[in-house]
Amino acid sequence: MNLQEIKNAIQNGSNVYWANTGYQVIKDNLDQYLIKHLSGYCIGLTWLDGITLNGKESEFFTI
């Protein structure tokens, strides 16, 4: 999934994951897209440039 596909899926109510179901992509109350681990640890979905994903496109998926 590319960045726009990930954002669209989340906006449409789908659950998006990275690498495995332990890492869910979320949109927080500040409209930031984050990769959140089950432990609560989060990183940004993208690098600071807002374009480059923190992961390969092929590693993002929906269930």
What are the residue ranges of the model-derived segments?
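Intrinsically disordered, low-complexity, charged/polar segments
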Residues: 42-63
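Mixed-charge, Lys/Arg-rich low-complexity intrinsically disordered regions
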Residues: 1-11
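Short beta-strand-centered aromatic/proline hotspots
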Residues: 22-33
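SH3/SH3-like beta-barrel fold
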Residues: 35-37
